[in-house]
Amino acid sequence: MRKIGNVILDDTCYQGRDLYTDGAIEDEMLEIARNVSPDRFNKVIGEKKSWPILYHFSHIRENILSWMPFTGKEKVLEIGSGCGAVTGALLGGAGEVTCIDLSMKRSEINAWRHRDSEKLKILVGNFQDVEKKLTEKYDYITLIGVFEYGEAYIQSQDPYVDFLKIIRKHLKPDGKIVIAIENRFGLKYWAGCTEDHFGTLFEGIQLSLIHI
């Protein structure tokens, strides 16, 4: 366990290597997070003209959670926090934020870009390992662009349902799960874009009720 600025970075469950990475560009992103203040990220994005840098550092990403009705007291668990693209939106409204991510490099990027925050803790490791050590109950648990990877990290016959069952154990009685995932009829497809993982049009989840 160590600190980057005020942020606690807990590597108790980290297995020593990053299994999910964008490659060498992450070294460049780490240098940006270390040496560039967030108010200058847009300038760097314009200069670099790099999709990963735009994707991970654009403040527009935070809009996906800007609607959440925070009062400043909530405890939030962000699963799959990556480089912290939406962590700032949570820190801006909630009382405490705990992040979980599989990648040490991405967690370091997240910690450096939010190093002034005194209410952020980042737990590095596979969710199935980390969640066994969670002692808190949360008002909100977020899965932003993460739920579709459940099959890769939840070892069971029905990984997506079991993923939700595991998460529910860590909610307060009136807590809520917030999921953002590709919508097969989303505006991006009507604009001609393809799905990120398969490269096809109109690919994604259909709205349905899952009993957990």
Where are these regions (language model features)?
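Class I SAM-dependent methyltransferase SAM/SAH-binding core
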Residues: 93-129
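Conserved small/polar residues in nucleotide/adenosyl-binding loops
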Residues: 210-212
